[in-house]
Amino acid sequence: MNILAFDLGASGGKLFLATIDDDNISIQEIHRFENVSCSMNGALFWDIINIYKEMNTGIKKAIELTGDQIDSFAIDSFSNDFGLIDKNGTLLTPVRCYRDKRTERHADHIYSKLSKEQLYNLSGNQNALFNTLMQLAAMREEGHGFILDNAYKMLFIPDLLIYFLTGKTISEYTISSVSQMYDFKKDDWCQEILDTYNIPRRIFGRLTKPGTLLGGTQESYNRMMETRGFPVSIVCEHDTASAYLSSPLTTDCALASCGTW
């Protein structure tokens, strides 16, 4: 069995191929690339096209190494950043980086609608300028609300890449849960937060739990990549959640998780 994993970080991306044979497992890194944000006209963006290209380069290597026999593929990444697509799957805007200053410019007005304490009580998330909620609210503040109004779906970066592979729109649970828009008590999006900041609920994909077998890659992608196709699985897309899940925790231990901030 050949399992391919794509870990996208804020400074680089890596693809690992795991081969399971009887009771043995071997893991090899097959592709690595740099991921750098780009400043343009006072805003900060991710080069999502290059990320997609590099992901495909790694997938192509896995296809060659396995004789086109990939049994499962999954993605995790940093949280909060997203792409907005129309019904044809076209990106409506470049993908902003969480370090962009637009949230800082409008933080006071955003927090005047719901205080930091109220937001924490509703979502359970830390108050941070990079949260997805802050980014979406800042879009309204900067006169870009029409993009939200005309968007078909808002997809977190792993879900956006999965959409390009499968044509399916989802919102994975762990990465949704740290957006500052999720209600853990109701196990659903927090309608009070969405209503307060005029964020249309319809733009979110179907909430999907880790462990879900989403299905195979779409035919157009298979033709482009010259592959028979492969199954896509949903894991803990929030990279910190995946790190904790795979850690050998016991009752008497401490774990420090750190990445690129």
For the regions a language model picked out, list residue spans one by one.
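Pocket-flanking alpha-helical
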Residues: 105-109, 243-245
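N-terminal glycine/serine-rich phosphate-binding loop of ATP-dependent small-molecule kinases
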Residues: 1-93, 121, 222-233
